[in-house]
Amino acid sequence: MFNDLKGKRILITGSTAGMGLATARIFAKYGAKIGINSRAFSQKVDDVLTELTALGGDVAFFPANLMDTSECERLVKEFTEHFGGMDVLINNAGGLGGRANLESIDDEFYERVMDLNVRSALMTTKFSIPHLRASAAESGQTSCVISTGSIAAREGGGVGAGIYAASKAWLHDIHRNWVKEFAKDNIRFNIVSPGTIDTAFHDGKSDELKSNIASNIPMGRFGDIEEVAPTFAFFASHACSGYITGQILDVNGGQIAP
């Protein structure tokens, strides 16, 4: 189904664990050229490189703290120099950044959550646009940006997670704006919006709370990262989604239905 991904140059931020790594595995199986990213190199990163290479990917690691604009720029520069360009950008870096109710939010908390989820995607996309534009012009097909959204963007998030939810809603909406600006360049923008997925994001929750959350999901359970990853491949494939842009694909077991 995704055979046109072979040789595609794909940068995935926040991709050495969890959903980002599961997504990298899909692309590796189809022979893509993959840039994986986290803040720093570690033995775990070395293990990930070995695993993805064994699956068939041409893989390189690019450390960067994407809460810093200059690091976003450096990441894109190093990736494109290594692989000779970029065909797909996946903005997966992000996270809760902590919890704070309205009356306890301060500038430091606000900036941390927004830098983690907004600045990282905004600036990495900004510096990627010239390369994605060139990719589309050279190939005669579309290039694309895929960002990881969240169910929280639609339902407001849990208590203390309002800034996180707002940051994801911002991401959902800015994609709509980018569609208007860059469709003429054959760059597509789509969102994968997971619901409650079994990742480290939920490690702090008690078993009782997790069970209660699962009971309110029509499919009766948390999703698995392997059930989310193929949606990124779908959006990355020109053959599958070359006429799809500006969309938000919910992967949530029916937790919220349009």
Predicted regions and their residues:
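Conserved glycine-rich Rossmann-like NAD(P)H-binding loop of the short-chain dehydrogenase/reductase
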Residues: 30-46
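Amphipathic alpha-helical dimer-interface segment in Rossmann-like NAD(P)H-dependent oxidoreductases
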Residues: 77, 116-139, 179-180, 184, ...
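Catalytic Tyr-X3-Lys loop
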Residues: 103-123, 146, 171
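Catalytic loop of short-chain dehydrogenase/reductase
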Residues: 137-170, 175-184, 196
